Amino acid sequence: MEQPFGSWGWGRSQLGRVAMACALAAGALVGSGAGGLTTAAADPADIAEPAVVRPPDVPTESAPPQPDHLAAARHLKQHKNATPVGTNDFGCRPTAAHPRPVVLAHGTDSTAYSDWSAIGPQLVAAGFCVFALNYGGAPGADTYGTEDLRVSAYQIGQFVDLVLDSTGAAEVDLVGFSQGANVTRYYTNKLGGAAKVDKWIGVASPTYGGVMYGLVPVAQVIPGALDVFAKVTSTAAVQQAQGSPIMLELNAGGDTVPGVRYVTIGSRVDEMIQPFSNIALRGAGAENLVVQDLCPDNLTGHFHMVYDPFVQELVLRALDPEHAPMPTCEPVALGTGIPQVIIAGNS
């Protein structure tokens, strides 16, 4: 297996809504009293194989790179159909140097443009055919990644088939941010996608779920608490809680499958996925990169990952270890990007 980082010498989405959800859920917990214990949280949408899956939305209005989530959100207000410039060009044909199209999957309560406005054009400039979908949206919604993860995984499969049919390629490389990592891995591992996927890259991947600022362990033993959280966030947000049925299902029998090359890119100071060790895959051959192990002074967290230049370069190098330059290590302050995400989520 390629190990593009083994020789190195160096030792998002809508936070405002999540913060509101945490406050409301905490209030519900306080008001509920002792209640009683339950053995496991119910999955909000427990469907093993959906009878009908709406096709994913494919944005087509080319839009410029942005420096952060806030700038992307402001552009989206006037351009709902925005896609990162150069992406979703269905006339693109892979080259010998880059034979596989790259499919980008955004995170929770987000869009292709919100999360990939910077990385998408970088990959296009590097010579890749790049495609980005909007998946997991409720009918009529202008944000995505909120619905059942299993249904979203089927949408990923539909989009991969569209990309392969259009480009003539045999396989794709998948790059998922946050929830996007989970739904692309569900497609790869559980829906037969491995036959069509060469590389899977998870950026800030909630591989084993998160504790949502410490609320999850408490909420899982108080009846109704997760229902409160789901109502003020989304089905998808609750499904990504540590120990949820779908997290257990996704990782049952091993978190990787043969024939696919896996890379995770995580941060020790991820605001949403704690313990941060929940990001790493445990399957044989998976490569788990931690930003601070490679660049100790870079304290980027969950919400800034896709707009951090170092992480962007890690993604490019994971996709193209033979040609991509070595990432440049620069200090990044703790909490970078969070104010922009809060403003974007409440404006």
Identify what each model region corresponds to.
Residues 237-273:
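The feature captures the conserved acid-bearing segment of alpha/beta-hydrolase catalytic domains
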Residues 114, 134-147:
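Glycine-rich "HGGG/HGxG" loop immediately N-terminal to the catalytic nucleophile
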Residues 94-98, 124-125, 166-167, 175, ...:
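Extracellular/periplasmic catalytic domains that process cell-envelope and extracellular macromolecules
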Residues 258-347:
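C-terminal catalytic-base region of ester-bond hydrolases, centering on the histidine
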Residues 2-121, 330-337, 342-347:
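Flexible, membrane-associating and regulatory peripheral segments of lipid-active enzymes
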Residues 105-106, 130, 150-251:
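Serine-dependent carboxylesterase/thioesterase catalytic core
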Residues 109, 137-139, 207:
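Alpha/beta-hydrolase active-site loop signature
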Residues 122-140:
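Conserved alpha/beta-hydrolase
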